[in-house]
Amino acid sequence: MPKFIEGKLDAKGLRFGIIVGRFNSFIGERLLEGALDALIRHGADDKNIEVARVPGAFEIPLATKKMAATGKYDAIICLGAVIRGATPHFDYVAAEVSKGVAHVSLDSGVPVAFGVLTTDTIEQAVERAGTKAGNKGFDSAMTAIETANLFKGIK
């Protein structure tokens, strides 16, 4: 019979870094509230949570890299919103942020949960930040908890 390794949804004793972009802050702050709610509900001590605010989504990957390099965190949660406008700026920012965050996770070995919304409209972002479509900040924190515990089980 194979051994199955799964992460549990228990944040007790885990340390989390959260990075949130200030651009579109009305969305970012709701995502942050959702992430903090998930962490605390699942046993995280607020003393083991550090939040870094960056100017916008484009700065998230570098801040994630700096956090991961400290070795202080069991998982990092990235939050923000990139909303499509009339120019191709959205395409460049959304692609680079997602690639940058993925590279940090792969290069550092630290679990990084991607909670940066990439939406076509403000309404879609609002829906994903705590209304119709749930709160992706909450979901990202759940991913961070589970993955951090999974990694502890892989020896």
UniProtKB/Swiss-Prot annotation:
This protein's pathway: Cofactor biosynthesis; riboflavin biosynthesis; riboflavin from 2-hydroxy-3-oxobutyl phosphate and 5-amino-6-(D-ribitylamino)uracil: step 1/2
Cystine residue pairs: none
GO terms for MF: 6,7-dimethyl-8-ribityllumazine synthase activity
Binding of (2S)-2-hydroxy-3-oxobutyl phosphate, residues: 86-87, 128
CDD domains in UniProt: Lumazine_synthase-I
InterPro entries: LS (IPR034964), LS/RS (IPR002180), LS/RS_sf (IPR036467)
Binding residues annotated for 5-amino-6-(D-ribitylamino)uracil, in chain numbering: 23, 57-59, 81-83, 114
GO cellular component: a single term: cytosol
Enzyme class: transferase
Active site: 89 (proton donor)
Catalysed reaction equations from the record: (2S)-2-hydroxy-3-oxobutyl phosphate + 5-amino-6-(D-ribitylamino)uracil = 6,7-dimethyl-8-(1-D-ribityl)lumazine + phosphate + 2 H2O + H(+)
Tagged with keyword Nucleus: no
PANTHER family: 6,7-DIMETHYL-8-RIBITYLLUMAZINE SYNTHASE, 6,7-DIMETHYL-8-RIBITYLLUMAZINE SYNTHASE DMRL SYNTHASE LUMAZINE SYNTHASE
Function according to Swiss-Prot or TrEMBL: Catalyzes the formation of 6,7-dimethyl-8-ribityllumazine by condensation of 5-amino-6-(D-ribitylamino)uracil with 3,4-dihydroxy-2-butanone 4-phosphate. This is the penultimate step in the biosynthesis of riboflavin.
Protein name: 6,7-dimethyl-8-ribityllumazine synthase
Species this protein is from: Geotalea daltonii (strain DSM 22248 / JCM 15807 / FRC-32)
Recorded name of the encoding gene: ribH
